[in-house]
Amino acid sequence: MVAVLALVAQLVALGLYAAKGARFARESAAGRIGTGMLLGMLGLGFVWLAQFPFGLAALWWERDHGISHQGYLTWAIDDFLLAGGRFLFISLALLIVMAIAGVWRRRWWLAAVPALLAVSALFAFVQPYLLPNIHALRDPQVAADARQLAAAEGIPGTPVRVQNTRNLGGAPNAEAAGLGPSRRVIVWDTLLKRFPPAQIRVVLAHEFGHLSRDHLWKGLAWTALLLLPIALVVELVTRRRGGLYEPTAVPLAIFVVVVLLFLATPLQTAFSRRLESEADWVALQTTHEPGATQALFRRLSRLALVQPDPPRWTKLLLEDHPSVMERIEMARAWRARH
């Protein structure tokens, strides 16, 4: 519910900014592109302020239920730094788009999409190097398991790194990150400390599955499919304000992008769930441990206090992973077939 309220707050804040934000351009002497970038950052600032109370409420709930041990001040600083990263990304995106619009007033969207994809690929490439508190695997048995699993999935030598998250607490996590030579698996230290070896193997095999099946590249391809129609709609909607050649169109453009991404949420979550299901299946095929897989998902569900079988609307709008029951049923189906 908090996530839904935060989304409503975001849409309301951006809707008001789209209606009134153009007037801020009159106060700027930063030039056409500079003013557009400032308006973009201002819009994200309004969104951050609107969502901040809901983030605090979510943290309070997690602390109250023992999911997180992070302090409020630490969380606020982290959230502010995360917002800074978003400011950087939106500024770079507006710099690219408005520069292209200066050359092709109404065809900018055709050239902007590949340029934005290149930026997204660059961010994906460097992201593993920007994560804090990272170190190599120190457990020789886990390291040996990781090497064996990576080789079994056709990606030998793929590194595994550990992220210290002792200040965050909560349910353990892991992720596949990077592109090409930067790709790797990141596991939280809480996973290694609190889960048995068989379940750690399942997690590692799942994350290696994302890499061996090129899910990050597929994610970029999916982004391209979304960006092209979104950019075209932005061009059509902002045309009365001069298109993205004019900085006064930036507040409306941001609102349109967020609304379109919201409307595409069911497609995005379905795509993500499909990739996660494939990684689950790869893990089962690699580890041959359906019992450990079922135990893993049950334990993660208890730690994170998530619904094993959430309502359909929640699944469509909020769930980018299969439900716990769906993942357990897959493990049972694998066992029945083998």
Where are these regions (language model features)?
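N-terminal signal-anchor/signal peptide hydrophobic helix marking the start
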Residues: 245-254
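Polar-ligand-bearing catalytic/cofactor-coordination segments
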Residues: 1-244, 258, 262-338
